[in-house]
């Protein structure tokens, strides 16, 4: 049931009676109250229970004044004050009562509730625990404690004793990992998954707390033949209990843990900022403690908390600390600090830049803490990515270099780019060496995807590289990276492609950042996995376990407004939301319409337009619906094969200000009193697109046809709807790959794609299908991602409507949608065959349209299932990993 943790309920006399029956010696010595005080006390509780709080407060004050030594009058006064939002005075009353008698469960409950209101969760848990110890039947308080700290009633585990000998369960040897087994050390190739845990509707810090859920996930990963799971940050105690439970019951199929230590960027890019660095090191100690089942973390916003009593150290492969540091932060830190050396107990750096030196210190700090506290060591690395790799990339000019080449070539300057500099500075794990006191070793960890940065695709040496399966620029990059780190393992700690409809970055071999249906995603992920093995990497950890709706990427982030609400809806145009092995899909699985699926689901959609003649040869019915991903349109047509060779279908959609927009349709020439922002033109199954009025097109996707230069274009502002009567609609192209210069002046043209291209087919055939015409049932079915219609947040019914030229994009509240359907005859002189609403003298009257609106939501509906990538990697991971020799084409010489 739902329970408000701030609700103040009256104490129950039954709790006190139960305690006194068991412990009569606890009965406090109470001064009998005179009749006026007793009457006031009784009247106070009567008013309290009838929600007359102000009357109750007056009665309790009177009773307490007349009988100040009686605990019951104080309890009543405290609860009445609390319910009147006088939290501080109420807390003082309860503390005073407990100072007089520490066995009063009602006073402890009151103290728990006031502490919670005052923001002291630890004190609230302590007081609540004391209250239910005295009154075990207090179900409401138990539920409150379950919310605050699910393990509040678990017995405290004894602190682990420090072993006398060094505990070593994993280590690095050359370019590989090894784990200890009953028969000694054996090579270990980590093949696993990054565990993101933010369910739809939840922030990334709102972790599931149910051990059964984590146990189910681990069981699924094990069935996939994964042997490793990586976490970025501290998860709730339930995860570690589930991991220990799985591994103790499946010792031959243990899942090893790679644990991260998360942090944000430091203030002013100062990694030596005292408070920030202290917090980072506190987090390191916490991770070490919880891995050994010896941590208690108090509640804090955005952080897992509780008693971590599950020792998972026997299966913790190593640590990966930090995050993908932004290059501007590393550059600023290096510029402000001198180079230096570091000689720690377990790691050394003979000479290096400030950031490399800092990383060595932090990793050594964590190893030293684990050794001192638990006499244990394990391999450690810091998070790195190609943007900060130690290699040199001739095709990746810096901003200064690119500006120089632009001036020399006469191209002019570009607009401000929305991107980091991807080869301006680097971090080199080779600079750090383990000492003789460190038998666990050291490794390099990279997040490496095939489609970014652009040097992955532009470098001629990478482009010539071939794995055993054929050309692979990704394989070329990995091979050079592994060759650079000849003495240590290279773990690819993130890789993969998403099953999103939208694309954020194009790849010439088709391994793009999005734009894959789920079958294609499975095939690409399997190929990348094989390339990683063959390139000589020490392991591969796929990104990610499940789709996480809160994520966002550069190409859509400005249009997801408010950004805080992305967790409430699923944007299929946002590549970052769709990497999961476990897909998280909008709506109720039992009722959500599916392209080519149960026709009854489409026919249950609300009716918006209906033809007067139900037997017309044209469109008979328009229906609309919605879920957390899509705007659905169903159009009932005669049940017969549609003649695409001679006819086409247009759907005109008004999303905002019905009197404003485009009042004439192209091809058909239909005019309308209603203005439209969008047009869907279905020419034939292999040629269908969404178009937008020019003023409402949010992207400037112009590329010079002669040079391929985009001049840094991306966004168009303002983005509004205006009256037009010229039939013009724009395509929904967006620039995904900006034009670039190499360091030698080589030019790489910009790339773009049409977001509005619609794919025909059933959902069973392709998860990125947009529309399907069921000829047999006579039902045209469309599902349009909200983002394609410039809906910035469907949960609050918010649209893009930007009258600004800079700053944040503007929005407006959605009113009603209106839609009309036209069947037109193709040819040199297109003609209208039929329309709904019906035309009057070749035009639509505003009175002929019926508006449709959807309701917002605060809690999304969703369902989940495994994607095909589960099966493709399950089969791949069942085979023993091979380490084929790296074969690389020589790098093409640079000018």
PLM regions and their residue ranges:
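N-terminal carbohydrate-binding accessory modules
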Residues: 153-220
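Register position in tetratricopeptide repeats
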Residues: 49-50, 83-84, 117-118, 147-152
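Acidic/polar low-complexity flexible segments
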Residues: 652-677, 790-894
